[in-house]
Amino acid sequence: MALKDLSTIDMYLRRWIISASLSVEHSLKVNILKDIQEKNIDEFNIVSEYIAKYPRIITELDNRRSTAYVKTLLGKYNHPNYPIYVFLEVIPFGEFVNFYKYYCAKYEYDGFNCTLLDNIRNIRNAAAHSNCVIHDLTNKAGFYNNYLVSRVVKLLAGVKKRTIQDRLKNKCVQDFISLLIAVDDVIKSEDLKNHCLQEIKELFDGRMVRNKDLYKSSTSLQQMYIFCKEIVHNVQPS
């Protein structure tokens, strides 16, 4: 019964992860396009410079010119000379993460902490491929992200820093919290942000604890649930 219940909870959590990560991706792109406009950066030149540094993307772009969803958009331009808004629209999320890091370094942009982007990509990919995200919660062999620790310390004033570091050594937990922080930091639309945060709060307060008696013997699951729930509740909707 516990495994069946947990798999259902995991499915609902994956749904939220996919929805939230899409919202974060959209907001990251909107924010970076705004910065490019404000800095008066040439919209074609920035793409050509990136492609020159990472020419592997040329093949990806060329392959996408024949896909139903973006071929009309890409067909308006001579390959591989695309304006930045088109480039960001058609590249996969993993490539966008790389571009975002490149842009932050080259143009001194500090819109969002780049060290969390790989965590977000990892949990987004896991959810999209229907991999379990509530997984191996006793494994704390990973490395915690110092920036993420500093953010969580501010959210959990009554929890020792060492405890926070210990919890974030679990890769699945660290990735989830990274996405939650991104929702708070990146999404500028208050309606969209509030919707994302309210959805995850309702999941933690509702479906996750509907059959809580099934998990009385799982100390690690209870600890991680309480840890994540406190963060979810302290990242308050505006």
Pin down the residues of each PLM region.
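Short, contiguous, well-structured surface segments enriched in hydrophobic/aromatic residues
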Residues: 1-115, 134-135, 170-172, 182-193
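Polyanionic, low-complexity intrinsically disordered segments
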Residues: 87, 97-122, 132-238
